[in-house]
């Protein structure tokens, strides 16, 4: 081992794009970033498709990105894995056990999930396959639709609803029960007032009532409300859940289903309805004691585990929105803290959308980081700045430019702090977002992630080096080389430090 320590700074949603038009990063005031890329070695990293275990041209996301960063290998992601395993869904033993209990109780099955082809949290085809399997098994099904508008265009819900309606039109035992924008049904920041509105529509049939889903969406559009923010509402004569019913969550990403599933499965008060027969696509969390249709495979010898096995200290810092990413996902789906691993969560601002506070909690993260650097205790510090992604998702380019300038100032403070220390600053991102903010073809804001590469920069390294282009799974091996720690055989990524010269 060397005396070096590493700070891995993940600029969530910061991509590279040579086109400066509608590019919040290129248009923002970034003197420190400009200085960084002019004097330190850099390369490009791919964050999408097969390079991160996703289908070809499938946009990456924060979960996939952090799994790839932390594991140091290409992990076949849940989207691809489930695409294969769901072909035999009618014979899935977990589904058959679930449906047998529904039949014994004379209940019905509630299916809930994000109706989207964004591929980030869910797959529309997965929901349709499960509906078909339940219909085949003679189970009555009601569907609770979560609308996207974030990983898809802001006004695109009717496209997916029409696909769903066309698919179920000849299935007499299947109907649509409720609709909710993901702002309510998929909150992950403990804003339980939002989650409660979605829960009340599902559990009790509370909310404005519409004859059909098309009318519900169109009414919200007429009021200026886009997909993500559509207020939970009820379709037809749906009256709510019964304790004898079953519940399937079709999202395969965990962070945005935990709150709503906790409300559905755990007793909250005497007026609360819970469904004990609940199942998910994967194991979402140790917080949720529910089975899954497609069990996850364990990822061993991640970067965090290796650092711990070396008896070295490591630290993770992020604000609420990205805390799970630098901990749970970075550790390969492990919730337990490694030995000598410390975690600090900085609360995210309590606002409706982050364009209202584009600084988010970046300054607080930076101040905390600097205090920890000065302790000279940690061999590895991992931080995530959420601004470029979370503000970028709003589609507000002016606010996103402010977010980028905030990050630039934070980078300047970090560089000043590590000057004349043994800390090496490694800067990268999990995917792009802020560098491409308008869809010219459809003449609307572009709020999703991008296919652009992200930067990889190594600052404060004691000798001159060159960096190769690569993929996210190459970052952990690079850090191990800097720390002079042997790369385990499970890590199939390669160090990006170019030793050809």
UniProtKB/Swiss-Prot annotation:
SUPFAM superfamilies: 2,3-Bisphosphoglycerate-independent phosphoglycerate mutase, substrate-binding domain, Alkaline phosphatase-like. GO terms for biological process: glucose catabolic process; glycolytic process. Mn(2+) 2 binds at residues 12, 62, 430-431. Belongs to the BPG-independent phosphoglycerate mutase family. Monomer. Catalyzes the interconversion of 2-phosphoglycerate and 3-phosphoglycerate. NCBIfam families: pgm_bpd_ind. This is 2,3-bisphosphoglycerate-independent phosphoglycerate mutase. The lineage of its organism: Bacteria, Pseudomonadati, Pseudomonadota, Alphaproteobacteria, Rickettsiales. The gene is gpmI.
């Amino acid at each position: 081992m060397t005396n070096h320590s590493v700070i891995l700074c993940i600029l969530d949603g910061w991509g590279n794009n040579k086109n400066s038009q509608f590019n919040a990063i290129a248009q923002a005031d970034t003197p420190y970033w400009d200085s960084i890329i002019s004097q330190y070695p850099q390369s490009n990293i791919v964050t999408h498709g097969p390079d991160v275990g996703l289908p070809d041209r499938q946009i990456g996301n924060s979960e996939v990105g952090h799994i790839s960063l932390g594991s140091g290998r290409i992990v076949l992601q849940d989207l691809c894995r489930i695409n294969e395993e769901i072909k035999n869904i009618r014979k899935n033993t977990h589904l058959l056990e679930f449906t047998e209990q529904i039949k014994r109780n004379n209940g019905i099955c509630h299916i809930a999930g994000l109706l989207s082809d964004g591929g980030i949290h869910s797959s529309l085809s997965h929901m349709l396959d499960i509906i078909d399997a339940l219909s085949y098994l003679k189970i009555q099904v009601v569907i609770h639709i979560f609308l996207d508008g974030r990983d898809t265009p802001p006004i695109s819900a009717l496209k997916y609803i029409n696909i769903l309606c066309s698919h179920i039109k000849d299935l007499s035992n299947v109907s649509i029960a409720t609709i909710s924008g993901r702002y309510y049904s998929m909150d992950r920041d403990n804003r339980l007032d939002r989650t409660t509105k979605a829960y009340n529509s599902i559990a009790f049939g509370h909310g404005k009532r519409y004859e059909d889903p098309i009318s519900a969406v169109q009414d919200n559009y007429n009021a200026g409300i886009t997909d993500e923010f559509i207020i939970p509402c009820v379709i037809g004569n749906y009256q709510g859940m019964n304790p004898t019913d079953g519940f399937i969550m079709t999202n395969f990403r965990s962070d945005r289903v935990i709150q709503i599933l906790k409300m559905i499965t755990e007793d909250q008060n005497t007026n609360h309805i819970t469904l004990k027969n609940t199942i998910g696509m994967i194991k979402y969390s140790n917080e949720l004691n529910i089975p899954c249709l497609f069990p996850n495979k364990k990822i061993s010898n991640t970067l965090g585990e290796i650092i711990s096995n070396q008896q070295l200290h490591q630290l993770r810092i992020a604000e609420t929105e990205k805390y799970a990413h630098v901990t749970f996902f970075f550790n390969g789906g492990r919730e337990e803290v490694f030995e000598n691993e410390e975690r600090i969560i900085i609360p995210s601002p309590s606002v409706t959308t982050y364009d209202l506070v584009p600084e988010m909690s970046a300054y607080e993260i930076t101040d905390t980081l600097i205090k920890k650097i000065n302790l000279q205790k940690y061999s590895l510090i991992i931080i995530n700045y959420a601004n470029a992604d979370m503000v970028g998702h709003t589609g507000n380019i002016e606010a996103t430019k402010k977010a980028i300038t905030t990050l630039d100032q934070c980078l300047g403070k970090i560089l000043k702090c590590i000057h004349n220390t043994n800390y090496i600053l490694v800067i990268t991102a999990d995917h792009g977002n802020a560098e491409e903010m308008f869809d010219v073809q459809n003449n609307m804001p572009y709020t999703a992630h991008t296919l652009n590469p992200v930067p990889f920069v190594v600052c404060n390294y004691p000798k001159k080096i060159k960096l190769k282009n690569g993929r996210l799974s190459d970052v952990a091996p690079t850090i191990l080389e800097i720390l002079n720690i042997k790369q385990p055989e499970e890590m199939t990524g390669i160090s990006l430090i170019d030793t050809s010269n």
